[in-house]
Amino acid sequence: MSGIKQQNTQPAGMRTINTLYFYLTEGCNLACRHCWMGPRFETKDSRHATLPVELFETAIREAKPLGLSGVKLTGGEPLLHPHFKTLLEIVRREDLRLTVETNGLLCTPEISAEIAKCPNRSVSISLDGTDAATHDWIRGVPGSFDAARQAVRNLVATGTKPQIIFSLMRKNVDQVDDMVRMAEELGASSLKFNVVQPTARGEKLHEAQEALTIAHLIEVGRYVEQVLAPQAKVDIFFHHPHAFKNLKRIASGNGYGACGIFGILGVIASGHYALCGIGEQVPDLIFGAVGEANLEDVWRDNAILKALREGLPERLEGVCGLCLMKEQCLGACVAQNYYSKGTLWAPYWFCEQANNAGLFPASRLAK
């Protein structure tokens, strides 16, 4: 296919599609206990659906006139896609910003070198423990710890310093300090501590009481931001809602921007547009088939997208509706809120639990 060089021709007043999130595969080569997507386990003998290259190109072609400037390649596991290198070639050809989220098992020196050819790139690697016993237990496959560490080394060797993502739970919370040191030693650009979402497998993890309590999450978040981050040799981020973040760090813009929900759209492996990867779990949040539904029509006219643009943040309910940070936070994660409560305006579970426990910062609530 020839280069997709259309200029931004979106109608006046229509929001820009900044980034397409491509969920390239329905399968994954790990079986992570906390995954919010819940992809099917894939082996050499069991293959699952992947997004066709032609639909990848179609989505980009139709998004370019609407302002597209970047893509995120995620999954499932994006490196399982049989034509991953071809997808990278398309990204380079169209001069798009590239983000890749991977577990690292297939991030070989060759793949790392291909990623490095994309000039505007970022990569994140999941590492959920500082030892094989912890990481492999969480990820469900022996050897995944060593593979993930090697993936970081491969990327660094080819000029890409990845972000390491560490998902917090009872099994690994005592390794937070050691994880900072490991990230520094491996040459990562940053380390992000993720809160496990109660979606798909993550919901089961919460039900099994393997997730951290809200009080513990708040305590760890405060420790990471106030103690670890100032002295670390890599950038440190803790993924909690704006109401719990340090105002100085928010003002710095250093990784603490608002949710990009107004400028992103998902493309799932079945070849459908969706709010994001939540479309894999919630059919209500699928917006039409790529190549059949015109993207400009979807972006402009879809009832859910229109409701979000018109209703956020004013229609947020509960503690989120009262929060002084709602303009920045936008409900933290609308997809998670809809999954939990069946409404776009539901309060974010983290903030709701904190408020119910008397732990929500009073200074961040409207009087």
Give residue spans per PLM region:
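Short Fe-S-cluster ligation motifs
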Residues: 58-75, 308, 346-367
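Residue-level signal for the nucleotide or nucleotide-sugar donor/cofactor binding architecture
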Residues: 51, 82, 143, 171-174, ...
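Flexible loop residues that form catalytic
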Residues: 40, 76, 128, 196, ...
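Short beta->alpha junction loops/turns
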Residues: 25, 77, 104-105, 128, ...
